[in-house]
């Protein structure tokens, strides 16, 4: 899908027969369209609430107010010290008090499959304001293109607005499915993923999950590359700057080694395997930071760097660590470095993950076709997400939505407001279908 008005224009895709769609769903779809301005106002309000790491309290309060205003119960799942001892919790573990995820369960009649809709409340820091044409927390709207600007507009305040709006429509239309529909509004997607982990550990599980994060209406993600963060330390040999040839400058040695490691790691892209061939470089090596220092007239004898890599299967965390360590040691030995490099494997690390089921993939495609999207490309991503926590519990999961947004993590992040009601209707169709099929009934019915 390209451009601004291609949701259904000229589409020859299969559109579901309205006669077999429950009248309540039709009314709900009409309500979604009729309240476009409400959804715009809601997203604008959410964008105007800064919610970076450890400062999410205000947006959590607002979500809880919205939920309780609908007569529902907001279950708070704390981000507390219990996470510190969890094997799959990532650092840093915050000590800031009263930080909570929000979970809302719409109970079904019974007998149907349950579904989680997961979105995240936290955002990336706003960055350098000088690089922007719109202030990061303004929620500025370009009326000509019906586009809203602001940090988190796509990632993931749009997902939050869609979940809250869908919740409101379901409640006010008195819709009830056979299975439970569970909304998870989580913290720390942008840094640790511990919010989704905490919700699942608290028992908020389901038969499938959709994470509203990172894609547009014609794209879904069913697997992720692995990631590995590490520190690299290198020691040199002391000497005065006036006779630097007698020493070994640790800063220079480390810079040269990092270039070698980057180039060696990137060469692995030449042998990448499908479906990762759709990316030019799923193997990525990024230097996040470097440090070296010395007195004025001396060479630095210690240097360190913080690095981050991504890697597709069949590589694993262990095989990537072995590759990097071998490359670093052989490079140092070949150049007669005074010391071998020291790798410190204490950073963020995730294995490649895939946990979608064919049933869930087909359901996403079917709901998209019903709404005029001829095809949804479902495939891998070189990024990472909270999918790994669902995979660990055997819960089928895809990332889908929240819609057409641009510049996440960059200046002038923005989102096309037409996709708020559009994606809301797709998730309504997905929910109606998934939650109305019994656990053991794997045959599909017509929506």
Predicted feature locations:
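N-terminal helical capping/dimerization or prosegment-like subdomains
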Residues: 2, 13-116, 120-127, 302-308, ...
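A structural signal for short hydrophobic beta-strand segments in well-ordered beta-sheet cores
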Residues: 104, 139-141, 287, 390
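Hydrophobic/aromatic beta-strand patches that form the interior of the parallel beta-sheet core
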Residues: 75, 115-117, 208-210, 288, ...
